[in-house]
Structures are given as structure tokens and as C-alpha cells.
Amino acid sequence: GFEDGDAKKGARIFKTRCAQCHTLGAGEPNKVGPNLHGLFGRKSGTVEGFSYTDANKKAGQVWEEETFLEYLENPKKYIPGTKMAFGGLKKEKDRNDLVTYLREETK
């Protein structure tokens, strides 16, 4: 389950594994993937102006630390039909670090 991780390590993971497709700040544009500002507490498939698959829209998943931690392990298993081309982060420590970073940076 989710435990507070190392946000600095999470930042490095974001930079190398996520930043090519996602932005974090309020008002920053969607890229290949949606802007992640306000991620926690938001329902999947609801970022304005982003073209989601039906699977993401229908999933109705509310993103919290625990649900996002699970999603990051294997996105295509968690939401079959997602177009996120990311194989997942297998190490729970890496996922905890990334979620800890995202929780701060997407507020």
C-alpha cells in the first residue's frame, strides 16, 4: 500500500519516465497525455480538452494515493483500453516516491 516516499527521487522518475507526455502545473497544456494538475481527488478521464479513450472515461476511477499507486504498477491491466503507452513501475518504492512527488506538485 501507499507510504510516503522520497519526493526528490519521485521528481527524477517523473523527469525520466513521465515528463515527455505529461505537464503538472495549473494551466499548462495537455501533451500526448493529459495535464496532471489537480490529479488527486479527480475522476479518471475528465481533464478538459484531452481526448481520452472510452475506457478511461468509463472507468470512473477517483485518483487517490492508493488507486494511483496500483494504476502505476500496470496501467493497461488497471484500465484495459487506456492509451497510456507506459509499461508501469514494477518497484513499489519507485511508485511511492513518484506518488509522493505528484501529490505535492499537482496541488
UniProtKB/Swiss-Prot annotation:
GO terms for molecular function: electron transfer activity; heme binding; metal ion binding. SUPFAM superfamilies: Cytochrome c. It is found in: Mitochondrion intermembrane space. Binds 1 heme c group covalently per subunit. Heme c binds at C18, C21, H22, M84. Keywords: Electron transport, Heme, Iron, Metal-binding, Methylation, Mitochondrion, Respiratory chain, Transport. Pfam families: Cytochrom_C (PF00034). One of its GO terms (cellular component) is mitochondrial intermembrane space. The keyword Electron transport applies. Electron carrier protein. The oxidized form of the cytochrome c heme group can accept an electron from the heme group of the cytochrome c1 subunit of cytochrome reductase. Cytochrome c then transfers this electron to the cytochrome oxidase complex, the final protein carrier in the mitochondrial electron-transport chain. Belongs to the cytochrome c family. This is Cytochrome c.
